[in-house]
Amino acid sequence: MVARLIAPQFLVLYAFAASVLTIHHRGKVRLPFGRQLTDHSTIMAPYNVLMYLFSAVPNKPVLPVGVVPELAKLRENWQVIRDEALNLFDEGRIKASEGYNDWGFNSFFRSGWKRFYLKWYDDALPSAQRMCPRTVALLESIPCIKGAMFATLAPGGRLVQHRDPFAGSLRYHLGLVTPTHPGECRILVDGIPCSWRDGEDLLFDETYIHYAENTTDQTRIILFCDVERPLRTRAMRAVNRWVSRHIIKESATENEAGERIGVLNKIFGYVYHVRL
């Protein structure tokens, strides 16, 4: 009986269960356990635990931006970035997906959240290169930035509590156009309130439970980036880059017709239409 319980297939199951419990109990704020079991972060739990074990930055919800010093370049050029974001906003180009081809953020569109992709896991979008070349050039000069977009949250918008599924990155926000009462437009990461302000930035671990709200009458516009998580060993950095390049990259989608849509989003669109 004992020999059967320690058979390789059971050891794999035990390791998976332990990683899911680690994710669930990480931080002060938790999803109901039933929801955690069906959350997409559960699928990535074993990989994410490896990322936490080998992380070269503290495993904390909110981090000093200085742990990734290259990001200072964005803050120093925030007005250049803001001007290009405002042009897109005024032209109505920061928008929700026009089809079911943005699996990662699909649920946000019903909550007043919109986006314009700049790059996604190393590839800059042609529309971004054409419409906001200075911002794209800045992003391309910082290799640790894997994905980036302009993101807006409309007056009254609220994103529900969630955790992102991939711990191979950290999340960076740079305030571009923010409400005059910052305490009323904020993000809470594991219960820690943070507000956006023009020209100020924030770095956090998006695999902690977080949500955002804008209770003002003004639209919030930020630069939103996925930053490669610093890791302690060359081997783990290589693994994480492979996963980013060959799996996470397949969640790419378009700003306008003709741009590349990754395999994961093609599958999502097919499944969504079949379900309907």
PLM features: what roles do these ranges have?
Residues 2-163, 220, 234-276:
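Fe(II)/2-oxoglutarate oxygenase catalytic core
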Residues 152-154, 165-182:
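Short, conserved beta-strand element in jelly-roll/cupin
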Residues 155, 192, 208:
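A generic "binding-loop/recognition-motif" signal
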Residues 159-162, 204, 210-216:
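Short beta-strand His + acidic residue motifs that chelate non-heme Fe in jelly-roll/DSBH
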Residues 171-176, 203, 218-234:
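A short hydrophobic beta-strand segment most commonly corresponding to one strand
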Residues 181, 217-218:
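Short strand-connecting beta-turns/loops that link adjacent beta-strands
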Residues 187:
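Aromatic-lined ligand-binding clefts that engage carbohydrates, nucleic acids, or primary amines
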Residues 190-203:
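Short acidic-glycine-tyrosine-enriched beta hairpin
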